[in-house]
């Protein structure tokens, strides 16, 4: 039982990190597009 809860919390934490990472990548791509568009 305890292990299952730990696993659930860990998977939730990983999901949140992946979501944040995904958003950061998208932001970087948008930034790159904006900068290349200026030139």
UniProtKB/Swiss-Prot annotation:
GO annotation, biological process? post-translational protein targeting to membrane, translocation
Keywords tagged on the record:
Endoplasmic reticulum, Membrane, Protein transport, Translocation, Transmembrane, Transport
**Tissue-level expression:** Pancreas.
* Cystine pairs: none
Identify the main location.
Answer: endoplasmic reticulum
> Which residues are the signal sequence here?
none
Q: Where in the cell is it found?
A: Endoplasmic reticulum membrane
GO annotations of cellular component type:
endoplasmic reticulum membrane
Q: Which family does it belong to?
A: Belongs to the SEC62 family.
Could you describe the subunit structure of this protein? The ER translocon complex that consists of channel-forming core components SEC61A1, SEC61B and SEC61G and different auxiliary components such as SEC62 and SEC63. Interacts with SEC61B.
Tell me, in a sentence or two, what this protein's role is: Mediates post-translational transport of precursor polypeptides across endoplasmic reticulum (ER). Proposed to act as a targeting receptor for small presecretory proteins containing short and apolar signal peptides. Targets and properly positions newly synthesized presecretory proteins into the SEC61 channel-forming translocon complex, triggering channel opening for polypeptide translocation to the ER lumen.
Q: What protein does this entry describe?
A: Translocation protein SEC62
Please give the organism.
Canis lupus familiaris
* Gene name linked to the record: SEC62
